[in-house]
Amino acid sequence: MVEPLDDAIWVARCIARMVELDPALDPELARPVVEDMCSRTRWRDMGPEAAAQAVFDLDMRRG
């Protein structure tokens, strides 16, 4: 079984993936959103990179 990631690591990895997907994204502006995501089981059950991808996929469908 895989050990769950520490919150700070999950947040850092999610933000890093978001910035990879959108280099214009300010990581500090993304931080409060990602910290909120980290507190929610729906997002936290995903890996941080998968959660970041899901946000961008959702945004692309809406856009």
Where are the language model's segments positioned?
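Residues within well-formed alpha-helices
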Residues: 13, 29, 50-51
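Short, charged early-sequence alpha-helical segments and their helix-coil boundaries
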Residues: 39-63
